[in-house]
């Protein structure tokens, strides 16, 4: 045990695409003595860790928490007693519905040095990858980001009367199971039934899928599309721009699943990913490598 506690850095991993991880976030991941990570989209994040780094999976998704938040808070504190640098790697941005504030306060109250490295939020990045600008002159002058998920794994109690301005884009996180009720709530509050709406699944990843409709029919459309979490709901006239601005799904290999041998500096993997391919890297032989699923994942 260290005489003094080490430093804990909360790093936002971004929306899933490793290319959207910040340079500062990557630096801390590479320096970490202990990496405490959530359910991440790519094993590449873990492959950045140095040899000997302690990897601890505390994955959290709806209805399936490997470790409760209170236990995660205590874990970070305990690990800071043994390691000089502990990195808490969180999807998106630590302070955008990531409970990063709770973790930081818990540590600060125990005199642990804390730093926060912001991440690219999926509330903006997933929209961009789907061809939807969150604001657009003459269409949307602002945006609201709302969690559709409560502390008890139920639908959040949303005051839809605050979301009726048609010049404001509404983005709902963690609400795939509640699309119909969200659409109904917005229409009841006064939003037009023909207001464009979209649901984006696995935004910024090669597995990205989107469903476009209106408030009146988006609930039925996503049932037919069978989209999966994580997903984002977008409501507003900016959704109508997606056909013209969608660069992501128009890449030549988008949606193609390709399995390749894992090599840490494999330029072929990088090139295929740039072209939109969904790459599954696999270990070959006994050398160091990275499996297709994060170590410690269920």
What would you call each of these model-derived segments?
Residues 78-80, 133-145, 215-226, 297-298:
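A polyampholytic, Gly/Pro-enriched intrinsically disordered region
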Residues 2, 6-8, 82-86, 150-271, ...:
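A contiguous loop/helix-start segment that scaffolds small-molecule binding in enzyme catalytic cores
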Residues 70-75, 129-132, 159-160, 211-217, ...:
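Short, surface-exposed amphipathic charged segments that create phosphate/polyanion-binding patches used
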Residues 43-44, 63-65, 121-125, 142-145, ...:
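Short gly/pro/ser/thr-enriched loop/turn and capping motifs at secondary-structure boundaries
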């Amino acid at each position: 045990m260290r005489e003094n506690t080490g430093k804990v850095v909360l790093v936002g991993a971004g929306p899933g695409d490793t290319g959207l991880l910040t340079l500062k976030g990557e630096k801390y991941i590479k320096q970490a003595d202990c990496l405490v990570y959530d359910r991440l989209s790519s094993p590449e994040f873990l492959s950045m860790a140095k040899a000997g780094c302690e990897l601890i999976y505390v994955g959290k998704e709806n209805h399936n928490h490997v470790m409760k938040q209170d236990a995660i808070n205590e874990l970070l504190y305990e690990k800071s007693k043994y390691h000089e640098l502990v990195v808490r790697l969180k999807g998106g941005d630590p302070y955008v519905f990531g409970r990063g504030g709770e973790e930081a306060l818990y540590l600060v109250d125990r005199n642990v040095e804390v730093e926060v490295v912001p991440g690219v939020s999926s509330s903006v990045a997933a929209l961009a990858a789907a061809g939807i600008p969150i604001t657009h002159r003459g269409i949307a002058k602002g945006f609201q980001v709302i969690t559709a998920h409560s502390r008890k794994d139920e639908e959040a109690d949303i005051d839809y009367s605050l979301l009726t301005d048609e010049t404001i884009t509404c983005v709902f996180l963690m609400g795939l199971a509640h699309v119909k009720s969200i659409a109904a709530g917005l229409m009841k509050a006064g939003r037009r039934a023909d207001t464009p709406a979209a649901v984006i699944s696995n935004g910024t990843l090669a597995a990205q899928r989107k469903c476009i409709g209106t408030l009146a029919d988006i609930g039925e459309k996503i049932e037919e599309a069978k989209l999966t979490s994580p997903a984002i709901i977008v409501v507003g006239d900016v959704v109508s721009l997606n056909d013209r601005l969608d660069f992501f799904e128009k890449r030549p290999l988008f949606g193609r699943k390709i399995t390749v041998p894992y090599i840490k500096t494999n330029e072929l993997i990088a090139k295929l990913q740039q072209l939109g391919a969904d790459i599954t890297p696999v270990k070959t032989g006994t050398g160091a490598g990275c499996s297709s699923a994060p170590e410690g994942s269920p």
